[in-house]
């Protein structure tokens, strides 16, 4: 963050990147895949596919993933989403059982893994960075509640933009790929919880957080 210059410039750049990411996700809430709503457990009749890499999912190539299933009757259920930390003991996707299993390696190649998270397909990371800026401003070494209040306002603007661009109708471009949509509770927790925690002793911060949540 320090490489971006002044705090005001940093927050403005992060906010703009976040808005672009959230608008893109609002228009493709499941990255173009079929909504996977019951995602708390492994679907029946599927096998788990585990990664060989350790790191954060930076990007999922949905076009390439869908093409791999063009002439294949099976379906893919994405467990990992952009921003997920993965390792070889954690399944990144479930695959409908079939005769040929060699496709698993090709499927894994569509999931780009990096050492760090990226804004590209990861709206939650955008909120986490915004919250981090606010928390740094609230640290005893900085003690700048004004910046934290400014960031809270920006966070509310990001979430409002996301809500305004969401559509009740989801366009499914890749019906063989099932993706869980973002959960509103997760978004609120990503942004507001750290700020509320670090600003617990400041009345003005708590008021802003409560107003933002309302």
Please provide the spans of the model-predicted regions.
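Short basic (Lys/Arg) and small-residue
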Residues: 2-77, 81, 90-94, 102-214
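Short, Lys/Arg-rich nucleic-acid/phosphate-binding segment
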Residues: 98
